[in-house]
């Protein structure tokens, strides 16, 4: 969940949208969905990975390649990352 600065959601989504094809092609990525809060104050990414290790390797790659720094001017605070286990009921 990325908290955003006022009026920055469209620009954030544009930059993020350009990066998502590489995310979806990254080893271990099964799915990524983007949700934009109606009031423009946040964007939520819901990702499914083969393992937590795959996601951590991907995130480190995004740090090294500069995407994390490129997103920084749009956010109002640190992103919130949560890990969930998919459960079948």
Question: Residue locations for each model-derived region?
Answer:
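Short beta-strand micro-motifs enriched in acidic
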Residues: 35-37
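Short phosphate-engaging motifs
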Residues: 8, 41, 54
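Short, surface-exposed ligand-recognition loops at beta-strand->loop->(often short) alpha-helix junctions
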Residues: 3-13
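An amphipathic, aromatic/His-enriched active-site/gating alpha helix that lines ligand/cofactor pockets
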Residues: 18-30, 48-82
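A short acidic, often aromatic-flanked loop/helix-cap motif at beta-alpha or helix-coil junctions
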Residues: 87-89
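Short aromatic/hydrophobic contact patches that present stacked aromatics
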Residues: 1-3, 44-46
């Amino acid at each position: 969940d990325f908290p955003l600065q006022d009026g920055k959601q469209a620009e954030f989504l544009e930059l993020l949208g350009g990066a998502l094809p590489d995310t979806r092609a990254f080893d271990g990525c099964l799915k990524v969905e983007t949700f934009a809060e109606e009031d423009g104050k946040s964007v939520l990414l819901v990702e499914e990975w083969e393992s937590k290790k795959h996601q951590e390797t991907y995130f480190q790659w995004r740090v090294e390649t500069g995407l994390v720094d490129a997103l920084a001017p749009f956010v109002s605070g640190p992103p919130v990352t949560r890990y969930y286990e998919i459960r079948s009921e």
